[in-house]
Structures are given as structure tokens and as C-alpha cells.
């Protein structure tokens, strides 16, 4: 920090002062002598510039972080698990909000982790730059959780969960970060991601009352109508549709990997990539490859299902990538550059029916001839859940590959139906799943065992049970209209553009 210009340095000093003020107000620690036999963990300052939805500087943030890596299990901490919201839950909630014309407001809990209580005796050295005069020999006995501690996330989640439940909210069985309350014949939903809260209700007054309620327990900042969440830019058009995109994230990736001047392409992956392994040199260091694929995977699972198949394929190479694989990664980025303004539309059309599409690319991986499963679930015209996954065994026929894919997709539908039930959306009818293989449909509704299918793992036959219990029902779909095809393999430009439009990706 000493090398920074004075104006810049002052901003960071003020940020650190603000952090210390919050720590003192919450009585995060007490100065004391270190008991014999105890060891004080260290701490450090972490500085970060926060950006808004347009990527511009919002504020300077300084955070005091405990060096939790030196904690000892069973002595300094025990349980550490804390739930994290699923992206599918966010898209589902926004779909319901769009259809019912509900308001969606964003709140940020300041220094959230500092509100959690800890029960262990933990001691920490005094923070650099803020050592108490004349008390240099003392240490901090922690009374509240602090960022960096092993148990901090769990302690905060326990605290906010207590507040929600004590005020009449029900925690979702499908997603522990989702809360709901039915009051005065109207629903309120709250979605929690660490210290970010989304409140959803028909009335502004009800949302403001919720903001006041949370403000009674924690220091809260009202960020207004939702516009930026988990790296996603969210806008609402005049028809009430939500439009999700990650252009800021994509632009940052292009800059990080020096592809700002690269030529855009119209497809994320060439079909020829899958047809042969090809000979090329091993990458000397696969760290850059892993970093790029990881970043692209987040984009693929959040707002861009059109690149999910390409990224799923490239993820298979992370342990031993070659130059051709790295070229394929860069091609995905070039595709994102050309389509950076694509947005995932969450439709306000009056339709909350859950439907699914499932497909498989039989033996598409030439390295081992294993197939790829792909599924897409939509509520009305909104894509809420999708996946691309390589199958673990070699399918002996296209029917077997499609049947395994259908089995995989059916696991998601059970969870989705529970999620909708938690949100008060009726799911009394079987969920329709579109399938383009007639033999799979016959196999799913029949208990016959023949020579061609007797070897199929029994675990996949839970499909029949779901059909018998009227949880799902398969409907034939012509191959040309199978949307999930885009989630199983690289497609030519014309087909890709057609299917991504059906998925709700629009300019």
C-alpha cells in the first residue's frame, strides 16, 4: 500500500477504518492475555474493489480475515457446512416472479459473518495497523465469527436461519437457502446467498416491511430492484420479462486471456473436434487451461446453456490437456465474444407448467465410445435447469444411451417438483418429458425384459416406477425439434441458432 498514490491510499485506509468500526460495534472480540497452552491464530487485511452491474468501480472494500487454516479440528472448530443457493432455484424464483408480476428487491447484509456466534475459545493476534497502544502484549478473544474462520459461514447461516424461522418463514426442503411465507393470501419468498438477500412479493409495502425486519437484526443495505446478482446482470423489460446476461463477466474473461482482438466465431465448438482425438503437444502447464474452463463452466451453468456441451467436453481434458484442447477453449471464448449480448429470457407469459427435454449423443466420445446425456427443463417458456454429462458406461445401442439419459434427467425432475411445491406452485399432474426415441418410451412404460435390454443396470429402471406413480410421463418428440440436442454435442450454426432461440436465448 505504501507504493500507492496518496489519494488511492486514503481510500483504502478509510475502508479499513470502516471495517474496524463495524468490528467494534459488534463487539467481535475482547482484548485479553493469551491463556497458557493456547495459541493465537493470525489475521490479515484483504482489499478488494467492488464493481457494479456495468463493471464500474462501486466502492473500496477492506476486510479483516482470520488465518483459519491454522485452526485445529475438534479443538478450534467442529461442523463447517453452510448451504449455498442453487442457480436453478434463482431462475425458478424469477420465473414465478415474472409470471405473477411480483416485485424483486435486493438487500445486502453488511459484515454478515460478524453476526454469527462462536462457542469455541478462539484467540487471534491484533490486526496490523490497529494494535492498541500500551496493550501490545494482549490478544483478541473472539466472541463473534470472523471472516476466514472455518466455522464462520455456518455460524452466520445459523443466525439468519433463526431470524427467518422465528418470523414465520418456512425453509424449503429442496433448497435450504430459499424461504417462503403465505400471509394475507399472498406469497413472500426470500432467497439467501451468504450475505445477499432477494425478497419477492406482489406489494412494495410488504417488501419494505421485510427490509425493516431484517434491519432490526442486522446492518442492511437496500440495493433496490434486483439488477446484479452472483455475477449476473438482471434487467426487466416493459412486459415484465427478466433478461439475464453476463456480458461484464465475459468481457473480463476476454481481457484476462488476451482475446479482446480475436475474431468472433458463430459456434462454440467444431463438430470435427469430437470425431478424432488428433495429435498435438501436451500443454506444459495445465493451470491456465483449468482456470479458463472453470470460469467458462460458471457461465455455461448460469446463463449460457448454448455452450454447456462444449464446456462439458472440454472439462474431460483438464487433467491432461493438449494444444488442440486449448485452441478449443479459446474458440468458446471467441464465440462468447461474438454473442456477448445474448440474454436468457425469463418469460412473463402466464404459464407455470414444468416440462422437460432429454437426449443423448450415442458413443460420441471417440476416446472410449461413451455417450453424453443432456436435459433441459423449462417452466412455460423459461429455461430453468439444464445439464450435459458423460455417461459412466458404454451403451450398446442408441436406445440404451437415451434410456440412461432419461434416467439421469428424471432425478432432476423429482427435485424440481419438490422445489415448485415449496414455492406453492401446484404439481398435481405428471411432468411431461419429451423424448425422441420411441423405443425408450416403450421401455419406460413396459415391464418386459428382452435380450436387447436385459443387461441395463437396474438402477435406471426407476423410470418405470416414476411413470407408474404418475410423477413423469414421456411424450414423443421428433428429433428435429429436440431442444436438448444442443446439450449433447457440437451443432452446426443453423441448428444451434434455432435451438438456442427455443431455449430463450435472445438478442
Which positions does each model-derived feature cover?
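Long, low-complexity, charge-biased intrinsically disordered regions
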Residues: 1-507
Amino acid at each position: 500500500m505504501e507504493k500507492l498514490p496518496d489519494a488511492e491510499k486514503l481510500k483504502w485506509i478509510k475502508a479499513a477504518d470502516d471495517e474496524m468500526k463495524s468490528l467494534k460495534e459488534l463487539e467481535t472480540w475482547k482484548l485479553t492475555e493469551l491463556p497458557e497452552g493456547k495459541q493465537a491464530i493470525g489475521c490479515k487485511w484483504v482489499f478488494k474493489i467492488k464493481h457494479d452491474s456495468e463493471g464500474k468501480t462501486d466502492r473500496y472494500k477492506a476486510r479483516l480475515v482470520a488465518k483459519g487454516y491454522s485452526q485445529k479440528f475438534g479443538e478450534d472448530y467442529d461442523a463447517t457446512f453452510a448451504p449455498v443457493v442453487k442457480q436453478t432455484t434463482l431462475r425458478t424464483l424469477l420465473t414465478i416472479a415474472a409470471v405473477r408480476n411480483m416485485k424483486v428487491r435486493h438487500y445486502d447484509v453488511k459484515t454478515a459473518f460478524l453476526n454469527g456466534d462462536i462457542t469455541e475459545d478462539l484467540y487471534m493476534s491484533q490486526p496490523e495497523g490497529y494494535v492498541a497502544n500500551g496493550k501490545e502484549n494482549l490478544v483478541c478473544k473472539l466472541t463473534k465469527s470472523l471472516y476466514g474462520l472455518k466455522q464462520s459461514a455456518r455460524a452466520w447461516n445459523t443466525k439468519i436461519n433463526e431470524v427467518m424461522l422465528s418470523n414465520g418463514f418456512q425453509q424449503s426442503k429442496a433448497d435450504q437457502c430459499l424461504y417462503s411465507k403465505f400471509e394475507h393470501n399472498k406469497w413472500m419468498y426470500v432467497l439467501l446467498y451468504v450475505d445477499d438477500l432477494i425478497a419477492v412479493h406482489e406489494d412494495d409495502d410488504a417488501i419494505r416491511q421485510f427490509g425493516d425486519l431484517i434491519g432490526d437484526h442486522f446492518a442492511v443495505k437496500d440495493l433496490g430492484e434486483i439488477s446484479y446478482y452472483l455475477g449476473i446482470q438482471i434487467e426487466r423489460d416493459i412486459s415484465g420479462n427478466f433478461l439475464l446476461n453476463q456480458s461484464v463477466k465475459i468481457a473480463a474473461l476476454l481481457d484476462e486471456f488476451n482475446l479482446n482482438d480475436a475474431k468472433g466465431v458463430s459456434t462454440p465448438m467444431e463438430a470435427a473436434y469430437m470425431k478424432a482425438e488428433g495429435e498435438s503437444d501436451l500443454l506444459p502447464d495445465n493451470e491456465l487451461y483449468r482456470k479458463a474452463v472453470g470460469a467458462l463452466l460458471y457461465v455455461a451453468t448460469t446463463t449460457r446453456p448454448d455452450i454447456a456441451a462444449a464446456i462439458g467436453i472440454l472439462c474431460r481434458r483438464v487433467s491432461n490437456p493438449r494444444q488442440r484442447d486449448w485452441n478449443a477453449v479459446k474458440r468458446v471464448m471467441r464465440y462468447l465474444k461474438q454473442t456477448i449480448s445474448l440474454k436468457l429470457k425469463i418469460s412473463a407469459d402466464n404459464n407455470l407448467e414444468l416440462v422437460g427435454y432429454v437426449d443423448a449423443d450415442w458413443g460420441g466420445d471417440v476416446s472410449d465410445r461413451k455417450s453424453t446425456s443432456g436435459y433441459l427443463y423449462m417452466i412455460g417458456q423459461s429455461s430453468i435447469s439444464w445439464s450435459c454429462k458423460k455417461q459412466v458406461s458404454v451403451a450398446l445401442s442408441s436406445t440404451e444411451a437415451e434410456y440412461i439419459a432419461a434416467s439421469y434427467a428424471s432425478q432432476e425432475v423429482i427435485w424440481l417438483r419438490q422445489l415448485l411445491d415449496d414455492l406453492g406452485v401446484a404439481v398435481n399432474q405428471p411432468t411431461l418429458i419429451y423424448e425422441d426415441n420411441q423405443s425408450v418410451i416403450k421401455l419406460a412404460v413396459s415391464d418386459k425384459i428382452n435380450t436387447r435390454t436385459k443387461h441395463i443396470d437396474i438402477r435406471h429402471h426407476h423410470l418405470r416406477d416414476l411413470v407408474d406413480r404418475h410423477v413423469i410421463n414421456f411424450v414423443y418428440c421428433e428429433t428435429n425439434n429436440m431442444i436438448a440436442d444442443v446439450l449433447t454435442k457440437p451443432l452446426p450454426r443453423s441448428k444451434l441458432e434455432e435451438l438456442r432461440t427455443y431455449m430463450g436465448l435472445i438478442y
